[in-house]
């Protein structure tokens, strides 16, 4: 909701969708700039909340200094989750090992701060499941699969582990 193409009519749009009984929005960041924007929008509306993180494709730009800023932002009272985090192997511009390293670090941050995680999983199902299991995510925090393109049997396995699912873009293709 904080993206530039909403600038012209954002307030009108948000008023309208709230009148249509949308009770809450969790607006995720994909880097520092968008995480800060998500918080700014959440501060403006009592029914909008933010999630902060580095999106898988953006982790190639992430370093310890930027991670420290994400940790700082994550402690804001309107930040309710760490996300959108995960792995995206569809695009080849960020090495898998870089994505995996920062995925783990962001899971650990969520656990440390007691916040749920919002997961992006595109063409990386086995590695996402393995890392979530190895980090104890299902036992130590709540897990929301936001972008999910895996199989029905894997979805059932995730549900059995207590995972939540949102309706996201992949249902359209």
Functional labels for PLM-detected ranges:
Residues 1-173:
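Mid-domain alpha/beta scaffold segments of enzyme catalytic cores
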């Amino acid at each position: 909701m904080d993206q530039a193409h909403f600038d012209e009519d954002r307030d009108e749009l948000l008023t309208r969708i709230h009148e249509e009984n949308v009770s809450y929005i969790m607006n995720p960041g994909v880097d520092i700039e968008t995480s800060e924007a998500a918080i700014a929008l959440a501060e403006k509306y009592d029914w909008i909340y933010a999630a902060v993180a580095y999106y898988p494709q953006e982790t190639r730009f992430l370093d310890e200094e930027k991670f420290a800023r994400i940790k700082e932002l994550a402690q804001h009272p309107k930040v309710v989750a760490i996300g959108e985090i995960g792995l995206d192997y569809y695009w080849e511009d960020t090495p898998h090992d870089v994505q995996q390293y920062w995925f783990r670090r962001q899971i650990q941050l969520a656990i440390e701060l007691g916040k749920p995680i919002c997961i992006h999983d595109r063409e990386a199902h086995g590695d996402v499941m393995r890392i979530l299991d190895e980090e104890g995510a299902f036992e130590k925090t709540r897990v929301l699969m936001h972008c999910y393109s895996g199989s029905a049997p894997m979805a059932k396995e995730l549900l059995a582990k207590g995972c939540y699912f949102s309706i996201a873009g992949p249902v359209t293709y």
